[in-house]
């Protein structure tokens, strides 16, 4: 298998049967992505999922190419917000042309300290596994909400719309015959 498509939950990929589901949160995403790599040995992993927009100008599907751990906070020991102590990877930047994604193990429904374009719960973990395993990584997020007090309701309302939009985008950009 050259391409492996992963998403956190089935509800994000209704009608997209080629997706493997890796669970919610960084630990589930990292562990299950690594298991899938061992089974399928892909050359590229494509992650799709929903995200909250910190940059409220964003709508629809965006490509994320910069990844940060928004809930890694060891500032009390003089590390920066998002920096994992003694880890060489301070952030993961695939390209400067896309948007930044702050990944953490919480659903964001209020302002956060980290300056990123979108927030999710899996992308950094998948990007890190891909980096460590030397696998190309692509990440697309559907803006389901604005990571504010309405985020919970907006996410539920927009979940199915994201799968439809992604299906259209993916069919134009990826060849399923190779």
Say what each PLM segment does:
Residues 1-4:
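Extreme N-terminal starter segment of soluble prokaryotic enzymes
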């Amino acid at each position: 298998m050259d391409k492996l498509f992963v998403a956190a939950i089935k509800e994000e990929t209704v009608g997209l049967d080629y997706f493997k589901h890796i669970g919610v949160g960084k630990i589930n995403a990292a562990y299950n992505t690594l298991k899938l790599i061992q089974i399928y040995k892909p050359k590229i992993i494509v992650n799709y999922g929903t995200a909250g927009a910190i940059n409220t100008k964003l709508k629809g599907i965006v490509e994320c190419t910069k990844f940060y751990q928004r809930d890694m906070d060891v500032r009390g020991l003089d590390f920066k917000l998002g920096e994992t102590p003694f880890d060489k990877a301070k952030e993961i930047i695939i390209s400067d042309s896309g948007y930044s994604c702050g990944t953490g193990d919480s659903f964001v429904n209020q302002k956060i300290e980290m300056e990123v374009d979108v927030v999710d719960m899996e992308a950094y973990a998948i990007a890190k596994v891909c980096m460590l395993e030397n696998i190309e990584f692509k990440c697309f997020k559907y803006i389901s909400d604005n990571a504010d007090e309405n985020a919970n309701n907006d996410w539920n309302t927009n979940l199915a719309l994201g799968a439809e939009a992604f299906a259209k985008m993916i069919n134009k950009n990826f060849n399923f015959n190779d």
